[in-house]
Amino acid sequence: MADEKRLEDLRSKIMESIGKSEKDVVPIENKRFNTDNAVIDTHFKRQKSDGELPKAPKSRNVSHSNNRGPSSIITMSTNRTTYEQTRAGPHRQSYRDASGRSYNRENRYSSHNTGPQWNNNPYNRQRDERRGRNERFDRRGRNGNGNYDRFNYQRKNEGSKFNGDRDKRQLQTNKYDMNYNSQNVMYPGSSFDSPAYYNMASSKANSRLVISGLSQSSDPSIVARLKDLLENFISGLQKTESNAEDFKISNFYIGEGRPDHIIVEFSSQICSTMVLACRSFFNAKLGTFDLKWRRPNDYVQQLDHLVDFCRGTVIALENLENIGEGEDYRMKELFSSLNVTNGTAKPLFYKCSSNTNNTGKESEFTKCILLSFEVVTQDILDKLKPYKWFKPNDGKISQVTSWITFQSLPNLVTQSVRVESRVLLLLNCLDPLDLKDETFITEIKETLKYSIAGADTIKICQPGVDYRLNFENLASGAGNIYIKFKTLEAAKHAMEELPGTQFNDRTVLCTYIDEDDFDMMEATQLS
C-alpha cells in the first residue's frame, strides 16, 4: 500500500508539472504542434539559420559553394586559396571574384577608392605576376642598366623604324646650334632627345649682336647701309653653307634710349658668330672704324663641345692682308702652320650685290677666317701672335648644357653665377595663352606691384598672334615677367624671398638680368 501511494503522488506531481508547462507556452508557438502541414512548413523555413542557405560569399576571398553547412564553405574556401597560392607561386598571388576578374589582395584598397582595384588585363597577368617571371629582358645587364638593355638595343638598331631617317629628323632643327657633350653624343645611348637638347641650348642672347658707335659717324644713312650689308652677307651664306636655309635677320632695331646702339637678332648662333667674325670687313665697307661689335652682357658661353663653330674655343682671324683673293696656297700654308685641317677652318666670303659689283665677281673674300680647336693651348696662342684675332664666342657667363637635367636643377639654380642688378626675371609664373586677355595682364601687373616692395617697372613678354605651346615658340620667352626695382637692395631682398613661392598656382623661379641689356633691348619689346 505504501508503494502504491508513492506511485500516485509521483503521478500527480508529473501531471501538475505537465499542466504548468502547457500554460507557459505562447499561443503562436502552439502552431508547432498543429497538424496543418502549411503552418509547419512556413515556420520551419522561418527558423532555418543563414548558414544552411545557399548564398554568395560575404567577402571576395570566400568562394561560392552550394553546400548548406558552414563548415563545408570554409573548407572549400581554404582549399581553393591554397590551390591558387600553389599555382601562382610566392610572387603571383592574384585572386578572382565570382565574375572571373582578378585583383591583388594585398593592394586592393587605396586612399581614393573603397573598393578593390580591378585589372581588366585580357591576359590576366598582374604586376606581381610579371615581377615574378624571370624573363630574359628583365635581367640586369653587365653595365648595371637594369631592365633597359632591351630598349637600348632597340634605340640603336631599330630607331629608323619609329622616327624615320636621322637626317630628316635633324632638318627640323639647326645643326649648327646642336650641342654635344664630351662623349660627342647628345645623350648616352640615344639620339631621340636631340630636339630637347637643342631647345635647352638655344637662346635669344646667344643670337644677338650689339653694334655701338653710330653717333660718331657723319653718314646719316649708315644704319640703312649696315642693314643692306648684313642682308647680302647672309644671303651669300645661304648659298655657300650647308644647312643654312634658315639663316636670316630676325630683328633689327635701335636700342631704347641709346640712339647710337643697334641690336641685330639672327635666327641662329652660328649666323651671329660668322657676322661677328667679319666685323673688320663691315667697318671697312662702311668707311668707319669707330663701330664696336660685341655680344650682349647676358650672353652665355657654351662649354660643351659644340658642332662646328659654336664652341667657346673658336678663334676668328681678321685683316689677313697677306692672303689675297684666289691665293689658296697661302691659305693652305696658314692652316698647316697652325695644324688646322680643312674641316675646322672656314674662310668667310661676302656675296656682292648687283649695285656695288664693279669687278664682276660674285663673291669677295672678307679676309676673315674662323678656326675651330678642340683645346686652345699655349702653343696655338704663340703661333697666332703674328695675326690679329679674337674669340667671337667668349663670354663672362658660361655653362655646360649637358649638365642640365631634372636631377641637377635644384643644385644649378642655387649657384650664383650672375652679377646682382636691379632687374629680376620671374619664370614659370604665367600661362602664355592667358596673356591674350588684356584684363588679365592688367590684374597681374597690379598684383605684383602691390605685393612686391620696391618694384619700379613691370614688363611682361606677351605671345604673338600665332603663338602655340610648342618648342618652336620656346625662345620667344612668352610669359616671362621682368621687374626693375628702385634700388639694388630691394632687388636683393626680392631675390631672397620670391624663389620657391607660389604665384598663380605655380612655383616662382628668379634670376638676375643685366640692367643695360634690359633698358636697351627688352624694354622696347615688352609691354
Swiss-Prot record:
UniProt biased composition (Basic and acidic residues): 42-55, 94-109, 125-141, 155-169
Summary of the function given for this chain in its UniProt record: Splicing factor that contacts pre-mRNA directly and is a component of the pre-mRNA-U1 snRNP complex (commitment complex 2) that forms during early spliceosome assembly in yeast extracts.
Positions where Phosphoserine occurs in the chain: S49
GO CC annotation: commitment complex; nuclear speck; nucleus; U2-type prespliceosome; U2AF complex
Gene assigned in the entry: MUD2
Biased composition (Polar residues): 60-85, 110-122
Name under which the protein is recorded: Splicing factor MUD2
GO molecular function, one term: pre-mRNA branch point binding
Record lineage: Eukaryota, Fungi, Dikarya, Ascomycota, Saccharomycotina
UniProt subunit comment: MSL5, MUD2 and PRP40 interact to form the commitment complex 2 (CC2), a precursor of mature spliceosomes.
Limits of the RRM domain: 424-511
One biological process term in Gene Ontology: mRNA branch site recognition
Region span, Disordered: 36-169
InterPro entries, per database record: Nucleotide-bd_a/b_plait_sf, RBD_domain_sf, RRM_dom_euk
Keyword field: mRNA processing, mRNA splicing, Phosphoprotein, RNA-binding
Misc: Present with 4170 molecules/cell in log phase SD medium.
